[in-house]
Amino acid sequence: MGYTTVPAPTGFIAKKEMIGIPLLSQWMVQMNCLFLDRSNIKEGLKTILTGIEKVKGGISMWIFPEGTRNKTEDEMLPFKAGSLKLSEKTGCPIVPMAITNSADILENHFPKVKPTHVILQYGTPIYLDQLSADDRKTSCCLYTKYGA
C-alpha cells in the first residue's frame, strides 16, 4: 500500500514477531521495515533510533501508534508511549492515515488471498512543534483533532 500511494521510499515499523514469517519478513527487510521488540525497552529504543536515521535519510516511516491492528472502525485504542518519537526527533510532520478493509485480503479467510477494495484515507499533516504542550503529552488527542 505504501509504495503505491506515497511518492517517496517508505518503510514500516512492525512488531518483532513478524520476523518469524518466512518470505514476508525477507520482503519487509528489503522494503526498509524495522522490527520493534515491544517487550524490551532497550531494543525498542535502538529500533526508534534506526527509524530516526531512516527518516533523516529521506525514507518515510509508517507507524501504528496503537501498537496493534485495531479491528474496530469506531474508536481508537490509546497510543503507545514513544509513538511520536520519530516526528519529535526529526521535525517531520505526522500524516494521519486510516486503512479500512485490509483484513479482507487475507486475515478474514486465511489461507486464501481475496481481491478486496482497501480504502486509504489521509488526514491533514500534523507538525508537533505547532501543538500545545498538553496536546503533545496526550497523543490520543491527535486522532480526535486531526484523524483521518
Per-region residue spans from a language model:
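Catalytic core of membrane glycerolipid acyltransferases/transacylases, capturing the structured
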Residues: M1-I41
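Alpha-helical structural signal in soluble globular domains
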Residues: T4-T5, L86-K89, Y146
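Soluble extracytoplasmic domains of inner/organellar membrane proteins
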Residues: I13, I19, L36, K42-G44, ...
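A secondary-structure boundary/capping signal
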Residues: A14-K15, N32, F64-E66, Y122
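A cross-family acyltransferase "interaction/gating" segment
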Residues: P22-Q26, K56-W62, K71-D135
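Membrane-interfacial terminal anchoring regions of lipid-handling membrane enzymes
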Residues: D135-A148
